[in-house]
Structure formats: structure tokens, C-alpha cells
Amino acid sequence: MAIQKRVLVAMSGGVDSSVTAALLQQQGYDIVGVTMQIWDPEVTVVGDDYVGCCSLTAVDDARRVANVLGIPYYVLNFRELFTEKVIQYFVDEYFQGRTPNPCIACNRFIKFEALLQRARQMGFDYIATGHYARLGYSEEFQRYTVKKALDDKKDQSYVLYGFTQDQIAHTLMPLADYTKDQVRGIAKEMGLPTYSKPESQEICFVHDNNYRNFLDERSQGGIKPGPFKDLAGNVLGEHKGIPFYTIGQRRGLGLATGERTYVIDIDPDNNVVTVGSEEAIWGTELIASENNFILFENLTGPQELEAQVRYNSKPSPAIIEPYGEGLVKVTFKYPQRAITPGQAVVYYQGDYLVGGGTIEKTIKQKN
């Protein structure tokens, strides 16, 4: 008789991770549920209505699901590591005039590194999450791979480009071939109490998505206002502080220029936010750092692929090529709107996730 494979399921208290646990249990795995405590509940739980993935409500919901499934359930403390790798990164990036993606940092350092390491120490064969992406092994590439989920609307491959081969080999994502409606239907049919729970659109550690207050509380010496300038260097008004702006932003500038005005550059060294017309926020080339590749070990020459510059956009034809030590130059066939330093650029070959990196700068803009 084959020995049951043991799986540690990351349960956020939402419907996706609930159904992940249920499906794997049905498939015969030996399941244990776990919620990662990544933020101080005394700070996070501002009101009874807060249901973020690290709230006490989320822990209660995950425990209720575990009880329905009859599986063991634990809460593991990752608060110190999360503060260092995600929260401090989030704060530092904004104060450097960049726009961070904390979900990618969390996946890279917490879920698929620290949790997998802990799972191995506890004797588990795999970890599992409620992400929508297809993991597997390709004979063609002779590598473990990540592909887009069946449901384009829910595909989360963009935030998974940091995967290593070892991590893919020891991670299960059983929702890859389901739609969200189907997942809710499974949860309802199985009597899981999270079947109708709404999706959280917030940054999990920022209550009410009010990141301005969050940053203000963590600023050293306070957030300083400074000048809005146009491309000619003329002062147009006063901004409220570098961390409150992102490339392509139009709302909330408080400028009366007589035309639609957008943030086109942020200079943290001189505390200047440059604004201009929409035309100035389109670019065709960028430089990316901290690149990771999944389909191959290293990028050795130019490749024609598709690249995506933000989570909710679509991949667009591009050429990626090495650009100095550790950097990649991405040249798009068509101009991209508001290429934003700090965000991820992710590379695709059809449905395959090739890899990705962090946008450092745009090096050419549309004229």
C-alpha cells in the first residue's frame, strides 16, 4: 500500500484555500491546515468588520473549515520575517519614489520559501495554496513549469515569477482548472462556511487600504511636501509627499492646469514630482533587475516573448535581452502606459510563465 503524501495547506480563511484543502483531501492526501500569522492582530484588527487574511476573523474562518473537513489546524508565527521582508520593503519602496508589490515579496520570501522550509521540518512532502496557476513538469523544457490558469480572469501567474524549480516541485495548486464560480459551488456543496465570503481587495496588512496613514505612521521625521514641476522645470504647486504618488496617477493631484495632468516622474532625492500630459507616460523600453527565470536557468541572448507590466494588464509582444550584470532590457512592440519602477515585469511564452523581474526605469518614451 502506497504511503499517503503529506500536504501542509496554507489557509487564509477564504474560499479558495478552503476548497484547496477539500480537493486535496478528496484526492487522498494527508492534509493539515495552517494559517501564517504575519501581522500583529492587536494592530490589524481595528474593527469587527475587518476580515483581511491575517485578521482574527480569518483565523476563525480557517479553523471552522478545518473542523468541517476533520483535519488538524495550526497557526504559525511568521511575524518577524514578514515585517522584515514585506512591510519594511513596502515602506522603503514608497519612500524611494517607487511602487511596491507586497504580494510578490510575500510569495517569494514567506509562502514559498519560509513556509516550505517549515513544512519540510515538520515532515510534509508538499505545501499547497489557493492560487490560480498550473504547476507541472515539461518534458519539452526538462524543467518544472508554471502556466496560466484556465480562468483568465483569476490567473495569478504574474505574482509567481519568483518560483524556483525546487519550490514548484513541492507545491500544489489544485484550483488551476476551475473558475471562481465553480470553486464557490464546490464550497457550498461541501458545506464549507466560507463559500460566500467576499474576496479581499486590500493589502492584507493595511486596514481599509489606507496606505497613506500606514506610511505616515512609519516615516522617520515625517513625510515632507515638495514641488510639483512640469517638464520645463516650472513649479505648478505643492505635493503632499513622495510616497503618495505613482507613475501615471491623475486623481488627487490638486492641480489646476487646464488639462488632464499625470505624474510622469518621481525624484525622491530632490523631493520633486514631475507632471505632464498623458503622452509622456507611455514608454516602449525598460530595464528590469532581480530577474528570475523558470523555463530556463539564465537569459543568454535576445528572446521574442510577451511581457506584462502590471497585474491587471495583458501581456504584450516584446524582446527581452541581457543588459549588463543581472539586468534585462525589455523592448515592447507597442508603447505601454505608465511603466512604473518597483512594479514587476513578467515574461510569458504563450501560457508558460518564463520569469520576471523588478522594473528599475523606463529608458525610452513615446514621442
From Swiss-Prot:
Q: Identify the catalytic residues.
A: C106, C204
Listed GO MF terms: ATP binding; tRNA binding; tRNA-uridine 2-sulfurtransferase activity
Single GO biological process annotation from the record? tRNA wobble position uridine thiolation
Organism, per UniProt?
A: Desulforamulus reducens (strain ATCC BAA-1160 / DSM 100696 / MI-1) (Desulfotomaculum reducens)
Q: Looking at the keywords, is Transferase present?
A: yes
EC top class named in words: transferase
UniProt function note: Catalyzes the 2-thiolation of uridine at the wobble position (U34) of tRNA, leading to the formation of s(2)U34.
Q: Where in the cell is it found?
A: Cytoplasm
InterPro entries in the record, alphabetically?
MnmA-like, MnmA-like_C, MnmA-like_central, MnmA-like_central_sf, Rossmann-like_a/b/a_fold
Q: Where is this site: Interaction with tRNA?
A: H131, Q343
Alphabetic keyword roster: ATP-binding, Cytoplasm, Disulfide bond, Nucleotide-binding, RNA-binding, Transferase, tRNA processing, tRNA-binding
Q: Where does ATP bind?
A: A10, M11, S12, G13, G14, V15, D16, S17, M36, G130
Recorded protein name is: tRNA-specific 2-thiouridylase MnmA
Task: Report the sequence similarity comment from the record.
Answer: Belongs to the MnmA/TRMU family.
Chain intervals for the UniProt region annotation (Interaction with tRNA): 154-156, 310-311
Q: Does the keyword RNA-binding apply?
A: yes
What's its EC?
2.8.1.13
GO CC annotations?
cytoplasm
Question: PANTHER family per the record?
Answer: MITOCHONDRIAL TRNA-SPECIFIC 2-THIOURIDYLASE 1, TRNA 5-METHYLAMINOMETHYL-2-THIOURIDYLATE -METHYLTRANSFERASE
Q: Which gene encodes it?
A: mnmA
Matching entries from Pfam families are given as: tRNA_Me_trans (PF03054), tRNA_Me_trans_C (PF20258), tRNA_Me_trans_M (PF20259)
Q: Which HAMAP family match?
A: tRNA_thiouridyl_MnmA
Disulfide-linked positions: C106-C204
Task: Provide the reaction this enzyme catalyses.
Answer: S-sulfanyl-L-cysteinyl-[protein] + uridine(34) in tRNA + AH2 + ATP = 2-thiouridine(34) in tRNA + L-cysteinyl-[protein] + A + AMP + diphosphate + H(+)
